[in-house]
């Protein structure tokens, strides 16, 4: 069966997940993003690649960083951008997701950027567009439930490649609440596809998926042991909003065991980089001295995110 993200020519049609996406597509996105990083340095930060196209940002969950970077990316490509305010929209008045999509499609939308609390919502939209003969409209998953956050995974890969070059000689550690993290799932899919020989996940048993070892990773419940000789440390926040009343340690208890401090970071390689998808909780999963330190590349991740999202939208808009 054909990958629903690719057209009959094997080109990117939607970006829904990094799981199962071919290595050459991921690499092509990273390669396409590289020249877009230079656009930010220009006096006029505009390219005409999506001129005349309409991009609708459909954010059914709160977001600042992701929504803003998608908006900036689309505008730098000269697209017309519509931000749907879900709090006051028809979805709060009982309209279904697909009815909302139908109505926006009737406004000649060319691309939907979708964030939704329900895993699979962007897939549902893409399937609906295909079934109703509107598969010229592209869908980008900006995060769905616990399932996936593909553009975050891609910008993380771009960041690693920028600082480390080759993926095939790295040890990468993902630390924290993997169980509730769509970012972690996208990171693991991309890292394994790109040939990283050792991906580690580090966290308490209660915050790791039961099937995590089947994802091709090494599991550590001792943070100090897991950080030994790693090249990249990817921190994750506690996803309190997805825990549904689970028993949690206090922030102080969590920080003591799982917070990244300078002392714990010293166990990694001397040139290891520290990443975080944001928002960051200082004094919980990461110490301020580390977040603001020379090994942190957290702000460059945000900058690279614009270029990566430009790459995704320009590739989708050209097919």
Swiss-Prot record:
Gene3D superfamilies, A to Z: Aspartate/ornithine carbamoyltransferase
PROSITE patterns: CARBAMOYLTRANSFERASE
EC number(s) stated in the UniProt entry for this protein: 2.1.3.2
Pathway it works in: Pyrimidine metabolism; UMP biosynthesis via de novo pathway; (S)-dihydroorotate from bicarbonate: step 2/3
Reactions performed catalytically: carbamoyl phosphate + L-aspartate = N-carbamoyl-L-aspartate + phosphate + H(+)
Keywords attached to this entry: Pyrimidine biosynthesis, Transferase
One GO molecular-function entry: amino acid binding
InterPro entries (alphabetical): Asp/Orn_carbamoyltranf_P-bd (IPR006132), Asp/Orn_carbamoylTrfase (IPR006130), Asp/Orn_carbamoylTrfase_sf (IPR036901), Asp_carbamoyltransf (IPR002082), Asp_carbamoyltransf_Asp/Orn-bd (IPR006131)
Annotated positions binding L-aspartate: 93, 182, 237
Function: Catalyzes the condensation of carbamoyl phosphate and aspartate to form carbamoyl aspartate and inorganic phosphate, the committed step in the de novo pyrimidine nucleotide biosynthesis pathway.
Subunit structure, as described in the record: Heterododecamer (2C3:3R2) of six catalytic PyrB chains organized as two trimers (C3), and six regulatory PyrI chains organized as three dimers (R2).
Protein name from the UniProt record: Aspartate carbamoyltransferase catalytic subunit
Gene name of this polypeptide: pyrB
